[in-house]
A protein has these predicted regions:
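Short, hydrophobic-biased segments on the C-terminal half of alpha helices
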Residues: 65, 83-84
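N-terminal leader segment of winged-helix/HTH proteins
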Residues: 1-41, 89
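Charged, amphipathic alpha-helical coiled-coil/dimerization segments
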Residues: 5-7, 84-139
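Residues within the DNA-recognition helix of helix-turn-helix
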Residues: 78, 82
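N-terminal helix-turn-helix DNA-binding core of bacterial DNA-binding proteins
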Residues: 33-75
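Pre-recognition alpha-helix immediately N-terminal to the DNA-recognition helix
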Residues: 22, 49-53, 114
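Generic structural concept
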Residues: 24-27, 55, 109, 138
């Protein structure tokens, strides 16, 4: 019979629980603030995150639906639907991949770029307690 505990995993102590609680609290405050910023701009937080991940993919200016699904931790079909909603809103466009016809690249439109930069600037202003994001000079 199993006790429910996994072998090799120590139970957290009081200080660790306090640290986890503080982290979750700060994370939730940030997410709520992000929801407010995005909503005021007329987009959802998922749309903002998609725009951020398209532009924030290392080494290029686009991403595939599969890559976006991974970054969003979402199902590929749900991510494809989100891309379609962003495309209908004029924020992104799909382009066939020249080297792999099975892949479709998602690119920001000019409107999507403007929206992303505006929202990212507002988010960056609130990253103060997250110094690890930009280093000490980014806040």
């Amino acid at each position: 019979m199993s006790s429910g505990r996994q072998p090799g995993k120590a139970l957290p102590g009081k200080e660790e629980l306090e640290a986890m609680s503080a982290f979750r609290y700060e994370l939730r405050k940030f997410l709520r603030m992000s929801e407010e910023i995005s909503s005021a701009a007329g987009v959802t937080t998922l749309q903002y995150q998609l725009l951020l991940h398209v532009r924030g993919f290392e080494g290029r200016q686009w991403a595939t639906v599969g890559e976006l699904a991974e970054r969003l931790q979402a199902a590929p079909n749900g991510t494809a639907a989100l891309v379609s909603r962003c495309e209908s809103a004029g924020l992104v466009t799909r382009k066939p991949d020249a080297s792999d016809r099975r892949q479709v690249q998602v690119h920001l439109t000019r409107k999507g770029e403007r929206c992303l930069l505006k929202l990212a600037a507002e988010h960056k202003a609130h990253y103060g307690s997250f110094g690890w994001v930009f280093g000490d000079s980014g806040a």
